[in-house]
Amino acid sequence: MWDYSEKVKEHFYNPKNAGAVEGANAIGDVGSLSCGDALRLTLKVDPETDVILDAGFQTFGCGSAIASSSALTEMVKGLTLDEALKISNQDIADYLDGLPPEKMHCSVMGREALQAAVANYRGETIEDDHEEGALICKCFAVDEVMVRDTIRANKLSTVEDVTNYTKAGGGCSACHEAIERVLTEELAARGEVFVAAPIKAKKKVKVLAPEPAPAPVAEAPAAAPKLSNLQRIRRIETVLAAIRPTLQRDKGDVELIDVDGKNVYVKLTGACTGCQMASMTLGGIQQRLIEELGEFVKVIPVSAAAHAQMEV
C-alpha cells in the first residue's frame, strides 16, 4: 500500500476545479483511456495579458492523477502562460507534500497537459514524435523523446525510475532493453555510467533453487495465489456493491458489464451519466479495484448504446 500525504488525500477526496471551465480558450489533452490514464486540462486565459483566470480538469485515472490535476489547477491560476510553463512535475509533487515514487507519472502527465493547453491557446503544434520507430513502450504508448526528456528533467538513472515517471516498462517488460539503451546514452552525456539494477525476481529464484525438492513443491500453490476469473468477478462485484450506496445517494449508480483480462467494463447510470465528476468516479473505482485485487486493472466506461451492441 502506498503512503499518501494528507495533502494528496485532501485533493483526492475534495478536488479543486473539477470539471471543464466554461468559456475555456485553452485545452490540453494527454494520455489515453486505453492505457488507464487520461487528462484534459481547460484554461480560461485573458487574451490581453496572457494571465490564467481559471482552470479546470477532467481525468480518468488513479487517486494520484486526480490529486495532481487538482493541485496543478490551483498552482496555475493567476500566473501568466510563461510563468505557468516553468512549473515542473516535481513542483506539482512538492505542492502535494510528495508523491509515492510509483505515482510520479501522474505529475508528469499534469505538466504535459499544461504544455498541450498552452500550445493549443497559441495555435502551436506540439511536435509529434510518436513515429512507429520512436515508440519504446507499446503497452503504454510512450515514445523515446518522452523517455529522454523525463530522464533529463528529473535526473533519472534506473529503469525503475523511468517506469515510475512515465509508466514505460510497467507492462510486459519487453521494452526494458530499449530503456536501458536510452539511459546509457543519457547518463553518458552527463558524465555518468549506467549500471543495470539487479532484477528482484532473479534473487527469489536463487534463494529457492537450493531448497530440497519437497519444499518448492509445498510452496508452489502458496506462491501463486492467483484468483480464478470467477473469484475476480466476485471481488469486483463486492467493491462495486460497497461503492453503490454513495452513488445512489446522488441518484446515480454503476453496473458491471464485463471483465476481459485486465479490462473491467462498467456502465454509469442515473445522475452519473454525463456528470462532470464521472471521470473521477471511474478513477476512484479503478483505484479501489487495484487495491482489492492486488493487480493493475483498467476501468472502462461503456455507453448505453455500446452496451446494447454488446448484448446483441
UniProtKB/Swiss-Prot annotation:
Changing residue 106 to A: Slow diazotrophic growth, normal [2Fe-2S] EPR signal. It comes from the Bacteria. InterPro entries: BFD-like_2Fe2S-bd_dom, BFD-like_2Fe2S-bd_dom_sf, FSCA_dom_sf, N_fixation_NifU, NIF_FeS_clus_asmbl_NifU, NIF_FeS_clus_asmbl_NifU_C, NIF_FeS_clus_asmbl_NifU_N. Disruption phenotype: No longer grows diazotrophically (without an external source of N). One of its GO terms (molecular function) is iron ion binding. One of its GO terms (biological process) is nitrogen fixation. Fe cation binds at residues 35, 62, 106. Its cofactor is Fe cation; [2Fe-2S] cluster. [2Fe-2S] cluster binds at residues 137, 139, 172, 175. Keywords: 2Fe-2S, Iron, Iron-sulfur, Metal-binding, Nitrogen fixation. Binds 1 Fe cation per subunit in a rubredoxin-type site. Binds 1 [2Fe-2S] cluster per subunit. Changing residue 35 to A: Slow diazotrophic growth, normal [2Fe-2S] EPR signal. The keyword Metal-binding applies. Involved in the formation or repair of [Fe-S] clusters present in iron-sulfur proteins. Belongs to the NifU family. This is Nitrogen fixation protein NifU.
